[in-house]
Amino acid sequence: MIKQALISVSDKSGIVDFAKSLSDLGVRILSTGGTAKLLADAGLSVTEVADYTGFPEMLDGRVKTLHPKVHGGILARRDLPEHMAALEKHDIPTIDLLVVNLYPFVQTVSKEECSLEDAIENIDIGGPTMLRSAAKNHRDVTVVVDPADYAVVLDEMRANSNAVSYKTNFRLATKVFAHTAQYDGAITNYLTSLTDELQHSSRNAYPATFNLAFNKAQDLRYGENPHQSAAFYRDLSVPAGALANYNQLQGKELSYNNIADSDAAWECVKTFDVPACVIVKHANPCGVAVGADANEAYAKAFQTDPTSAFGGIIAFNREVDEAAAQAVARQFVEVLIAPSFSAAARQVFAAKQNVRLLEIALGDGHNAFDLKRVGGGLLVQSLDSKNVQPRELRVVTKRHPTPKEMDDLLFAWRVAKYVKSNAIVFCGNGMTLGVGAGQMSRVDSARIASIKAQNAGLTLAGSAVASDAFFPFRDGLDVVVAAGATCVIQPGGSMRDEEVVSAADEHNIAMVLTGVRHFRH
């Protein structure tokens, strides 16, 4: 039975209403600092911890709750007579409910202007200590670290004469240990990343110990294949515009492959400034286009490879209106993603309830790291977020690209970044014409891309080609030129660059080097 609560929170959302409800249930409230002032200003009867312990806060607030009268009241087992006798001897009442969340360390160190001193001052000491004490003694103490749990605790207290079930206490305790582990992991990541800076005046973005923390969003029916189990986890701090921010408006539950493919489509489409559509199959774009609106962009993207688009993932960077919805609804689609859907578009898809509609607000945030598991280890790299600007390009052939060709080259290069290596992409007039992906040799990717265009009835005459990495030999270049390409964009850097450039001059095509490779595995 909860008779006394200690409340000390950094995240004060909902805390006044929660405390008022506790007070209405006859619970005595202890508090500290800013939380105590907030509750007192709201008209609540609050006892400051310093008054409760008889020991003042000291060291600029570093020592507030580190006192036997606090931790004794939390840690005492109510079922052990010797514990209760010790409390009575030292005049220590039990603390039955602890409501604490911690100094905002992660938010502090994420600011560019954050100094080491700022970070250190935002390492909470008393909070984690109380949380761990209460979580350890969860049989007797209810501990709340997440404002989302306020309502659950109140409902149980009202229904059970101020008591909270062991099942709920156990669940809340596990949240505490997960929270403090994440908190300490963030501190470790930050401080170990500074080791090189302190010793060599250069900060290392990759800490000596790398801690990851995610919260489970949902269990999935299965993984990449039906015999694999799976779940989806969200980052503790989801970047603006990231897939994990999705709001599912309708449709079946998302699968593992749906989420993976949706991320590939969304990451590609949101890089465009004009209305764009990206169709993805098995994490590869099979059609990408820009247009005057979503409907035109979709029509052009679908032309690239109607066969592969069947059962694909479609992403837009503009609202899906009725016209676009009607066009998409004629095809079999697994997932449709957009910043928004008009009411008329929603009505179109109401007749196709299996289609998963995901609404995601646009944003340019991205993950800090790209992660890949290997046997017994983890590969960590910065995200491939490099977007080449026109001024960075270098024309290496006798013939320069025309303005139209340059537009097509930049479009092709943007798409190639999201195609599995080896990647060859034919483009023209704001749309992909043929995509060759994931082949072990670049020349085979070139052949496949040209075959794809032929199968779709699209001409490659006058097209632009992007290659995600350099041409190791002239053979790949010969294939794309034979198919009709008149300009090529590629990183360069091959030992045979001179031979490849000479071949381009021989064919009288324009070649542009980016100096940037976009391998994608």
Curated annotation (Swiss-Prot):
Presence of keyword Transferase: yes
GO molecular function, one term: phosphoribosylaminoimidazolecarboxamide formyltransferase activity
SUPFAM superfamilies reported in the protein's UniProt record: Cytidine deaminase-like, Methylglyoxal synthase-like
Database matches in InterPro entries: AICAR_Tfase_dup_dom_sf, Cytidine_deaminase-like, MGS-like_dom, MGS-like_dom_sf, PurH-like
Any matching Pfam family: AICARFT_IMPCHas
Signal peptide: none
Domain commentary: The IMP cyclohydrolase activity resides in the N-terminal region.
Family, per entry: Belongs to the PurH family.
Protein name: Bifunctional purine biosynthesis protein PurH
Source organism: Paraburkholderia xenovorans (strain LB400)
Gene behind the chain: purH
